Amino acid sequence: MPRKSQGAKKTVTEQFEVLVRDLAAELKKHYGARLVSAVVFGSVGRGSPHPDSDVDVLVVAEPLPDGRMPRVRDFAAVKNALAARLTRLAEEGIHTTLAPIFKTPAEVRRGSLLFLDMIDDGRVLFDRSGFWRDFIQDFQERLRRLGARKIITGDRWYWDLKPDYKVGEIFEI
Protein backbone atom coordinates (compact mmCIF):
# COMPACT_ATOMS: atom_id res chain seq x y z
CA MET A 1 0.00 0.00 0.00
CA PRO A 2 1.49 3.36 -0.96
CA ARG A 3 2.39 5.73 1.84
CA LYS A 4 0.90 9.15 1.95
CA SER A 5 3.06 12.21 2.11
CA GLN A 6 2.81 14.52 5.11
CA GLY A 7 -0.39 16.49 4.96
CA ALA A 8 -2.01 14.15 2.45
CA LYS A 9 -5.79 14.04 2.59
CA LYS A 10 -7.20 11.11 4.56
CA THR A 11 -9.27 8.50 2.78
CA VAL A 12 -13.00 8.22 3.46
CA THR A 13 -12.37 5.12 5.57
CA GLU A 14 -9.69 6.92 7.59
CA GLN A 15 -12.02 9.88 8.15
CA PHE A 16 -14.72 7.54 9.46
CA GLU A 17 -12.18 5.78 11.69
CA VAL A 18 -11.38 9.09 13.38
CA LEU A 19 -15.09 9.85 13.76
CA VAL A 20 -15.76 6.41 15.28
CA ARG A 21 -12.87 6.83 17.71
CA ASP A 22 -14.28 10.19 18.80
CA LEU A 23 -17.79 8.73 18.99
CA ALA A 24 -16.57 5.99 21.34
CA ALA A 25 -14.91 8.58 23.58
CA GLU A 26 -18.04 10.76 23.68
CA LEU A 27 -20.30 7.79 24.43
CA LYS A 28 -18.08 6.84 27.38
CA LYS A 29 -17.97 10.44 28.56
CA HIS A 30 -21.73 11.06 28.31
CA TYR A 31 -23.13 7.73 29.49
CA GLY A 32 -20.37 6.98 31.99
CA ALA A 33 -21.26 4.03 34.24
CA ARG A 34 -24.60 3.69 32.42
CA LEU A 35 -22.86 2.53 29.22
CA VAL A 36 -22.92 -1.25 28.90
CA SER A 37 -21.95 -1.72 25.24
CA ALA A 38 -21.52 0.28 22.05
CA VAL A 39 -21.39 -1.42 18.65
CA VAL A 40 -20.94 0.23 15.25
CA PHE A 41 -22.47 -1.75 12.39
CA GLY A 42 -23.42 -1.37 8.74
CA SER A 43 -20.92 -0.08 6.19
CA VAL A 44 -18.87 1.71 8.85
CA GLY A 45 -18.71 -1.46 10.96
CA ARG A 46 -17.61 -3.41 7.88
CA GLY A 47 -14.89 -0.84 7.19
CA SER A 48 -16.35 0.05 3.79
CA PRO A 49 -18.07 3.42 4.25
CA HIS A 50 -19.00 5.73 1.40
CA PRO A 51 -19.05 9.53 1.64
CA ASP A 52 -22.80 9.43 2.35
CA SER A 53 -22.77 6.50 4.82
CA ASP A 54 -24.41 7.05 8.15
CA VAL A 55 -22.83 5.79 11.35
CA ASP A 56 -25.12 3.06 12.68
CA VAL A 57 -24.42 2.54 16.36
CA LEU A 58 -26.11 0.36 18.94
CA VAL A 59 -25.96 1.99 22.37
CA VAL A 60 -26.72 -0.40 25.23
CA ALA A 61 -27.09 1.52 28.47
CA GLU A 62 -28.85 1.28 31.80
CA PRO A 63 -30.85 3.08 32.81
CA LEU A 64 -32.25 4.70 29.69
CA PRO A 65 -35.26 7.00 29.51
CA ASP A 66 -38.49 5.34 28.42
CA GLY A 67 -39.33 5.85 24.76
CA ARG A 68 -37.35 6.68 21.64
CA MET A 69 -37.58 10.48 21.74
CA PRO A 70 -36.34 10.87 25.33
CA ARG A 71 -33.44 8.58 24.40
CA VAL A 72 -32.67 10.71 21.35
CA ARG A 73 -32.72 13.84 23.53
CA ASP A 74 -30.33 12.11 25.96
CA PHE A 75 -28.00 11.27 23.02
CA ALA A 76 -28.02 14.92 21.86
CA ALA A 77 -25.05 15.65 24.13
CA VAL A 78 -22.97 13.11 22.17
CA LYS A 79 -24.15 14.50 18.84
CA ASN A 80 -23.44 18.07 19.94
CA ALA A 81 -19.93 17.12 21.08
CA LEU A 82 -19.24 15.75 17.59
CA ALA A 83 -20.94 18.59 15.67
CA ALA A 84 -17.71 20.38 14.71
CA ARG A 85 -16.18 17.15 13.37
CA LEU A 86 -19.36 16.37 11.39
CA THR A 87 -19.27 19.89 9.92
CA ARG A 88 -15.61 19.49 8.90
CA LEU A 89 -16.41 16.15 7.27
CA ALA A 90 -19.27 17.75 5.32
CA GLU A 91 -16.89 20.46 4.10
CA GLU A 92 -14.67 17.65 2.79
CA GLY A 93 -17.56 15.98 0.98
CA ILE A 94 -18.42 13.36 3.61
CA HIS A 95 -22.07 13.88 4.45
CA THR A 96 -22.68 11.54 7.35
CA THR A 97 -25.06 11.42 10.26
CA LEU A 98 -25.14 9.49 13.50
CA ALA A 99 -27.87 6.83 13.50
CA PRO A 100 -28.13 5.47 17.04
CA ILE A 101 -30.28 2.57 18.21
CA PHE A 102 -30.86 2.55 21.96
CA LYS A 103 -31.47 -0.57 24.03
CA THR A 104 -31.27 -1.53 27.66
CA PRO A 105 -29.65 -4.90 28.44
CA ALA A 106 -33.14 -6.37 29.01
CA GLU A 107 -34.26 -5.11 25.58
CA VAL A 108 -31.18 -6.65 23.96
CA ARG A 109 -31.94 -9.99 25.62
CA ARG A 110 -35.48 -9.90 24.14
CA GLY A 111 -33.78 -9.91 20.74
CA SER A 112 -34.20 -8.08 17.46
CA LEU A 113 -33.74 -9.04 13.83
CA LEU A 114 -31.50 -5.97 13.65
CA PHE A 115 -28.87 -7.99 15.49
CA LEU A 116 -28.48 -10.22 12.41
CA ASP A 117 -26.61 -7.31 10.79
CA MET A 118 -24.24 -7.14 13.73
CA ILE A 119 -23.07 -10.76 13.62
CA ASP A 120 -20.55 -10.16 10.84
CA ASP A 121 -20.54 -6.37 10.60
CA GLY A 122 -20.64 -5.30 14.24
CA ARG A 123 -17.54 -3.62 15.60
CA VAL A 124 -17.46 -3.32 19.35
CA LEU A 125 -16.40 0.09 20.63
CA PHE A 126 -17.09 -0.65 24.29
CA ASP A 127 -18.28 -3.76 26.12
CA ARG A 128 -18.44 -3.68 29.88
CA SER A 129 -18.07 -7.17 31.35
CA GLY A 130 -18.42 -8.76 27.90
CA PHE A 131 -22.19 -8.22 27.80
CA TRP A 132 -22.39 -7.84 24.02
CA ARG A 133 -19.82 -10.55 23.34
CA ASP A 134 -21.80 -13.05 25.42
CA PHE A 135 -25.13 -12.01 23.92
CA ILE A 136 -23.99 -12.20 20.29
CA GLN A 137 -22.30 -15.59 20.86
CA ASP A 138 -25.53 -16.96 22.32
CA PHE A 139 -27.52 -15.42 19.44
CA GLN A 140 -25.20 -17.07 16.91
CA GLU A 141 -25.59 -20.41 18.68
CA ARG A 142 -29.40 -20.15 18.52
CA LEU A 143 -29.15 -19.38 14.80
CA ARG A 144 -26.82 -22.36 14.32
CA ARG A 145 -29.31 -24.68 16.05
CA LEU A 146 -32.05 -23.47 13.68
CA GLY A 147 -29.78 -24.07 10.69
CA ALA A 148 -29.95 -20.38 9.78
CA ARG A 149 -27.81 -19.27 6.87
CA LYS A 150 -26.73 -15.90 5.55
CA ILE A 151 -27.27 -15.96 1.79
CA ILE A 152 -25.00 -13.56 -0.09
CA THR A 153 -25.88 -12.50 -3.64
CA GLY A 154 -23.44 -9.97 -5.04
CA ASP A 155 -23.19 -7.08 -2.61
CA ARG A 156 -26.53 -7.93 -0.94
CA TRP A 157 -27.56 -10.59 1.52
CA TYR A 158 -30.50 -12.01 3.37
CA TRP A 159 -31.01 -14.60 6.08
CA ASP A 160 -32.78 -17.93 5.71
CA LEU A 161 -33.52 -18.30 9.42
CA LYS A 162 -34.96 -21.81 9.29
CA PRO A 163 -34.34 -23.62 6.00
CA ASP A 164 -36.60 -26.52 7.00
CA TYR A 165 -39.50 -24.23 7.98
CA LYS A 166 -42.98 -25.70 7.52
CA VAL A 167 -46.05 -23.51 6.97
CA GLY A 168 -47.69 -22.72 10.29
CA GLU A 169 -44.64 -23.70 12.33
CA ILE A 170 -43.71 -21.33 15.13
CA PHE A 171 -40.08 -20.91 16.13
CA GLU A 172 -37.97 -18.55 18.20
CA ILE A 173 -34.54 -17.20 17.55
Regions found by a protein language model. Name each.
Residues 42, 56:
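Conserved G/P- and acidic residue-centered "switch" motifs that form tight phosphate/ATP-binding loops
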Residues 1-34, 45-52, 62-173:
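Catalytic core of pol beta-like nucleotidyltransferases
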Residues 57-61:
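Short beta-strand->loop micro-motif that forms the acidic, two-metal-ion catalytic signature
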Residues 34-40:
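Short, glycine- and small/hydrophobic-rich beta-strand elements in well-ordered beta-sheets
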